[in-house]
């Protein structure tokens, strides 16, 4: 699954004020804090707590919020909050929580759970953030499938320092604040609160001489070309997951995923409804009246429809199997052709004369030539009885 929209996570609109964002976060944090949720639902509550914390950290910072509003998750700079800032890591623990609430949870919960998942060396390990990419394709491409290339901006491991963040020939040192633990304990009265170390941001290490290529981040922004296989029958809004092509993890953590979300261009002829297609077919007045064969378009060529004599405007003809075979469908949908009877325009004098003669002959025949008009006239008469 991709990362949820930060505004959706907090339950606020995109125009929410700082106070509204903070209030929404406090409410969610109180509800889902791990110390308040034990038993079967503990893990789900913990994930929601982390998700709300991440959303708040992003939207409470004006610069990060502006970048997120413009580019979404893909545009968030992982170094905006210093070398240890990792948006979307999902395992950052609860550090910073006490900073947002002051003494509230120190009084309520006591010791606070801390730290993210740790690797073999004791360092906190973070999964890279998921990225999203909107890809626009034609209806034909959606129906038949295609292979395409996309170029995306992404963060990759720095070639100079190989992801360490340290200048070549040097190395990171244990953090003197947390002594390499990545977390610190704060005393508040009778309570002890564990939170992410504010000095090393949970890494347990400090880089005395940062790499000049990545400024100590361990990763740099690059353009990456990826092959995307679009399956036949894909629909608007469906996503294709490219595993491991999101942002790289930190401290040996796994990379996130890239989700390619499909947008289908508006077609000049067809409208799609699930696996079915709809189109409007213009028909001359004379053909509708006299009947005859007409040619209609399909995604695989053209087909022929035999119009019966007296075809009315709005009549729908169904061509079975001429729609789209969806990804999870066993059979293709149908094509619905909606007749649009066209009234002739720009008539010559001779044509006008012929139509007037035809009109007079219709009037002499009464309502038998216009069944719809007859029923409408009867309804009007009934209305005024």
UniProtKB/Swiss-Prot annotation:
Keywords: Chaperone, Cytoplasm, DNA replication, Metal-binding, Repeat, Stress response, Zinc, Zinc-finger. Residues 26-48, 362-385 are annotated as: Disordered. It comes from the Bacteria. CXXCXGXG motif repeats lie at residues 158-165, 175-182, 197-204, 211-218. Its main location: cytoplasm. It is found in: Cytoplasm. Zn(2+) 2 binds at residues 175, 178, 197, 200. GO terms for cellular component: cytoplasm. One of its GO terms (biological process) is response to heat. SMART domains: DnaJ. A zinc finger (CR-type) spans 145-223. Zn(2+) 1 binds at residues 158, 161, 211, 214. Gene3D superfamilies: DnaJ domain (1.10.287.110), Heat shock protein DnaJ, cysteine-rich domain (2.10.230.10), Urease metallochaperone UreE, N-terminal domain (2.60.260.20). Residues 5-72 form the J domain. InterPro entries: DnaJ, DnaJ_C, DnaJ_domain, DnaJ_domain_CS, HSP40/DnaJ_pept-bd, HSP_DnaJ_Cys-rich_dom, HSP_DnaJ_Cys-rich_dom_sf, J_dom_sf. Residues 35-48 have a biased composition (Basic and acidic residues). It holds the Pfam family DnaJ. The keyword Phosphoprotein does not apply. Its cofactor is Zn(2+). Homodimer. Participates actively in the response to hyperosmotic and heat shock by preventing the aggregation of stress-denatured proteins and by disaggregating proteins, also in an autonomous, DnaK-independent fashion. Unfolded proteins bind initially to DnaJ; upon interaction with the DnaJ-bound protein, DnaK hydrolyzes its bound ATP, resulting in the formation of a stable complex. GrpE releases ADP from DnaK; ATP binding to DnaK triggers the release of the substrate protein, thus completing the reaction cycle. Belongs to the DnaJ family. The J domain is necessary and sufficient to stimulate DnaK ATPase activity. Zinc center 1 plays an important role in the autonomous, DnaK-independent chaperone activity of DnaJ. Zinc center 2 is essential for interaction with DnaK and for DnaJ activity. This is Chaperone protein DnaJ.
């Amino acid at each position: 699954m991709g990362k949820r929209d930060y505004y959706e996570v907090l339950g606020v609109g995109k125009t929410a004020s700082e106070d509204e964002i903070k209030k929404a976060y406090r409410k969610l944090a109180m509800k889902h804090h791990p110390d308040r949720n034990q038993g079967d639902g503990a893990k789900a509550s913990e994930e929601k707590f982390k998700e709300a914390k991440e959303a708040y950290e992003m939207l409470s910072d004006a610069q990060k919020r502006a970048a997120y509003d413009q580019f979404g998750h893909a545009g968030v700079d992982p170094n905006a909050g210093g070398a240890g800032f990792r948006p979307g890591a999902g395992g950052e623990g609860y550090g910073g929580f006490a900073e947002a609430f002051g003494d509230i949870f120190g009084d309520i919960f006591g010791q606070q759970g801390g730290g993210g998942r740790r690797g073999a060396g004791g360092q906190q390990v973070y999964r890279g953030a998921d990225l999203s990419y909107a890809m626009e394709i034609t209806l034909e491409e959606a129906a038949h499938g295609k292979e395409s290339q996309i170029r995306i901006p992404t963060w990759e491991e720095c070639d100079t320092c190989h992801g360490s963040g340290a200048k070549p020939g040097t190395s990171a040192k244990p953090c003197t604040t947390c002594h390499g633990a990545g977390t610190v304990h704060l005393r508040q009265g009778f309570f002890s609160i564990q939170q992410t170390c504010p000095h090393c941001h949970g890494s347990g290490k400090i880089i005395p001489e940062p790499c000049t290529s990545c400024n100590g981040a361990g990763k740099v922004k690059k353009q990456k070309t990826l092959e995307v296989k679009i399956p036949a029958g894909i629909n608007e809004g469906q996503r294709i997951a490219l595993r491991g092509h999101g942002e790289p993890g930190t401290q040996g953590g796994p990379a996130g995923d890239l989700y390619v979300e499909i947008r289908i261009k508006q077609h000049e002829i067809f409208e799609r409804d699930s696996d079915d297609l709809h189109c409007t077919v213009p028909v001359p007045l004379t053909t509708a009246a006299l009947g005859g064969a007409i040619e209609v378009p399909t995604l695989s060529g053209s087909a022929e429809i035999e119009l019966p004599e007296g075809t009315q405007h709005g009549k729908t003809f169904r061509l079975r199997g001429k729609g789209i075979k969806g990804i999870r469908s066993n059979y293709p949908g149908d094509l619905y052709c909606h007749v649009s009877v066209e009234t002739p325009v720009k008539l010559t004098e001779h044509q006008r004369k012929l139509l007037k003669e035809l009109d007079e002959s219709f009037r002499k025949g009464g309502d038998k030539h216009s069944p719809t008009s007859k029923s409408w006239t009867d309804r009007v008469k009934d209305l005024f009885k």
